[in-house]
UniProtKB/Swiss-Prot annotation:
Cellular component GO terms held in the UniProt record: cytoplasm; cytosol; ribose phosphate diphosphokinase complex
Protein family: Belongs to the ribose-phosphate pyrophosphokinase family.
Disulfide pairings: none
Entry protein name: Ribose-phosphate pyrophosphokinase 2
Organism: Schizosaccharomyces pombe (strain 972 / ATCC 24843) (Fission yeast)
Compartments (UniProt record): Cytoplasm
Record-linked Pfam families: Pribosyl_synth (PF14572), Pribosyltran_N (PF13793)
PROSITE patterns named among the record's database cross-references: PRPP_SYNTHASE (PS00114)
Chief location category: cytoplasm
Catalytic reactions of this protein: D-ribose 5-phosphate + ATP = 5-phospho-alpha-D-ribose 1-diphosphate + AMP + H(+)
Coiled coil location: none
Enzyme Commission designation: 2.7.6.1
Amino acid sequence: MASNSIKIFAGNSHPELAEKVARRIGLSLGKVAVVQYSNRETSVTIGESVRDEDVFILQTGCGSINDHLMELLIMINACRSASARRITAIIPCFPYARQDKKDKSRAPITARLVANMLQTAGCNHIITMDLHASQIQGFFNVPVDNLYAEPSVLRYIRENIDTTVNPTVIVSPDAGGAKRATALADRLDLDFALIHKERQKANEVSRMVLVGDVRDKLAILVDDMADTCGTLGLAAKTLKDNGAKAVYAIVTHGILSGKAIKVINESALEKVIVTNTIPHDDKRSLCSKIETIDISGVLAECIRRIHHGESVSVLFSVAPA
């Protein structure tokens, strides 16, 4: 058993999630003061000793992403300078995860740059969830635990949707998410369908083609990320046009930027279920279709297991209560 104690600090991106995680472990959040000067520089002061402690810093990729990323880097570096034994960054929604490859001439691989910056700042370990591209783990020279929302999603479906009464089909909104959707369908013993989408430019889908049978069924769209929700809106229309009785969407990272709320409200989607890797309270007040799955239990159990040197692989298949 580790002799050093756990210290959990929260950045400004998602203090509510950090508070839930700390409460589940039976701790209070560590004292930290983050100040932004009039010239937009960020200053961080760690308000308690972290010498020889096991430090966890929670900061997710949302809102003012660049400010939050810099804040995280400074917090990590401050803890390293204060002689923390180990520093783990908990980044539920990893920033710049969609910039993971050189997909056109002179394009930067920004996800790798973020990985390098985190390590240079002094990070010893990364916890994240449903990376948009799993190969991002290879950008790090420190351990990365990429947790899955799937166990929590399975629990939500089993507790809230009676698939024996309502014939249900799991749908991937694109070919890239087929593996995720088929894994979920297999564990629930449900049918699977796929939507092929053609893009003319980023965030805009021009045409969708359905592969599979959704007629008279509840169709559940499953994806790792929903940004402007253009894909989900068009996918829901495609499913309804092909006879689906109702359409839900379950998404790990509900970024919901731009006109996303307007798109959801005007779409054929009856529910959009997102995890709380990103805060949604302001969005939920504008859209009654949005529901939230709490993943604080997964993060808390991961922290406990890492601190005590236990395996975290059980969290890939079971969601803590």
